Amino acid sequence: MAIDDKTRTELEAATFRTLVAHLRERTDVQNIDLMNLAGFCRNCLSRWYREAAAEKGVSLSDPEAREIVYGMPYDEWRKKHQKEATPEQKAAFAASQPKH
């Protein structure tokens, strides 16, 4: 199956928007769990977004990029949804650190 570059870019953009929307809905899924299981989290997505913007000459701050991914200011999201990491989560994160 051959997909032209324009269509591929549109499909990738739609997939990214769907992923971001899914993560906004799944506030029960903590970033540390994402990091431990998949090696990335919402903060990683926002950093990659900011880096991609910079490659195109678009200046975005970390807070601006995080708001794009979180759908609200990061501090607000943390207050509403972030839970204290358990000792087990912290240990798993430390053990997987070289993979991040």
Language-model regions: role of each:
Residues 2-100:
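Domain-level signature for proteins that mediate thiol-based redox and metal-cofactor handling
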